[in-house]
Amino acid sequence: MIKEFNTQTTLNVGLEALWAAQSKDITLVVPKVLPNIVKDVQVIEGDGGVGTKLIFNFLPGIAPVNYQREVITEYDELSHTIGLQVVEGGYLNQGLSYYKTTFQFSAISENKTLVNVKISYDHESELIEEKVKPTKTSESTLFYLGQLEKFLLNGA
């Protein structure tokens, strides 16, 4: 059964800049935002919308796995929502059978954005949930968003 974990953060960056970075510019931005973790991000198939397949290549020795393939399963420019589902590698190599992160961006003001994050996951064994806790994976996501904020504020 798929479980969900929700969290949110507020970033001091405008909605449009965040949306562009997390959607159409994701392959360029992620390696710059996480240069000590992500070697590169490549589009394997698609045009950036629903169904687009991405591969995130990690630097050797940093993560327990060296790559993660993801598919964009949600993409809505009106609600500024993007969902990325891991389909190979990454958390799936750590015992999860399903893992998806959905970001929804909402403007608070011209230079402030609320980011709602929903992590959906499933696993074969309760022992796996102890090993790959959603709170821990959400911390990684919030760390990424904080680094993204710094990157965009520094004139990216």
UniProtKB/Swiss-Prot annotation:
<keyword id="KW-0611">Plant defense</keyword>
<comment type="function">
    <text>Binds gibberellin A3 (GA3) in vitro.</text>
</comment>
<dbReference type="GO" id="GO:0005634">
    <property type="term" value="C:nucleus"/>
</dbReference>
<dbReference type="Pfam" id="PF00407">
    <property type="entry name" value="Bet_v_1"/>
</dbReference>
<dbReference type="GO" id="GO:0006952">
    <property type="term" value="P:defense response"/>
</dbReference>
<keyword id="KW-0939">Gibberellin signaling pathway</keyword>
<keyword id="KW-0568">Pathogenesis-related protein</keyword>
<feature type="binding site">
    <location>
        <position position="22"/>
    </location>
    <ligand>
        <name>gibberellin A3</name>
    </ligand>
</feature>
<dbReference type="GO" id="GO:0038023">
    <property type="term" value="F:signaling receptor activity"/>
</dbReference>
<protein>
    <recommendedName>
        <fullName>Phytohormone-binding protein</fullName>
    </recommendedName>
</protein>
<dbReference type="GO" id="GO:0005737">
    <property type="term" value="C:cytoplasm"/>
</dbReference>
<dbReference type="GO" id="GO:0004864">
    <property type="term" value="F:protein phosphatase inhibitor activity"/>
</dbReference>
<dbReference type="InterPro" id="IPR023393">
    <property type="entry name" value="START-like_dom_sf"/>
</dbReference>
<comment type="similarity">
    <text>Belongs to the BetVI family.</text>
</comment>
<dbReference type="GO" id="GO:0010427">
    <property type="term" value="F:abscisic acid binding"/>
</dbReference>
<dbReference type="InterPro" id="IPR050279">
    <property type="entry name" value="Plant_def-hormone_signal"/>
</dbReference>
<feature type="binding site">
    <location>
        <position position="68"/>
    </location>
    <ligand>
        <name>gibberellin A3</name>
    </ligand>
</feature>
<dbReference type="GO" id="GO:0009740">
    <property type="term" value="P:gibberellic acid mediated signaling pathway"/>
</dbReference>
<dbReference type="InterPro" id="IPR000916">
    <property type="entry name" value="Bet_v_I/MLP"/>
</dbReference>
<dbReference type="GO" id="GO:0009738">
    <property type="term" value="P:abscisic acid-activated signaling pathway"/>
</dbReference>
<feature type="binding site">
    <location>
        <position position="141"/>
    </location>
    <ligand>
        <name>gibberellin A3</name>
    </ligand>
</feature>
